[in-house]
């Protein structure tokens, strides 16, 4: 079980959660994801790792409330626990040796753009970001 340490409503349909997951945070890299289950009977939900903090041992996820499982996840508050939180999964995005990059994201897909842009910047790469949303109410 993993504790929710921060919850922020980014807009009426998108939520950010920071979750205690030290083993996941220790190994997380940009471009990877986690799979969670809200409770023992819940379905498995794959979500992008939007950020990670190795020192605090936390993983940040951003999700759009679109169906039963994300509605159930959104009911949880700071201090509540997520039943299963597995990761990091997937192949990290290649970031080594690049000099100038445009990182593009749209809507909730901007969640994956941030850790990639952050890592590239840390490596000394010139990073330009292009983000888009359907309308001003959906900006995260």
Which residues does each predicted region cover?
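FNR/FR-type flavoprotein reductase catalytic core
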Residues: 68-140
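Ferredoxin-reductase
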Residues: 1-78
């Amino acid at each position: 079980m993993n504790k929710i340490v921060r919850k922020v409503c980014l807009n009426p349909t998108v939520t950010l959660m920071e979750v205690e997951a030290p083993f996941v945070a220790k190994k997380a890299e940009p471009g990877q994801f986690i799979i969670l289950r809200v409770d023992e009977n819940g379905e498995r939900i794959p979500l992008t790792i939007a950020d990670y903090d190795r020192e605090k041992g936390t993983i940040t996820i951003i999700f759009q409330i679109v169906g039963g499982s994300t509605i159930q996840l959104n009911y949880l508050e700071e201090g509540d626990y997520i039943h299963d939180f597995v990761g990091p999964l997937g192949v990290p995005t290649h970031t080594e040796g690049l000099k100038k990059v445009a990182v593009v994201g749209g809507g909730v897909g901007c969640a994956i753009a941030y850790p990639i842009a952050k890592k590239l910047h840390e490596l000394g790469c010139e990073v330009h970001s292009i983000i888009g949303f359907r309308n001003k109410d959906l900006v995260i």
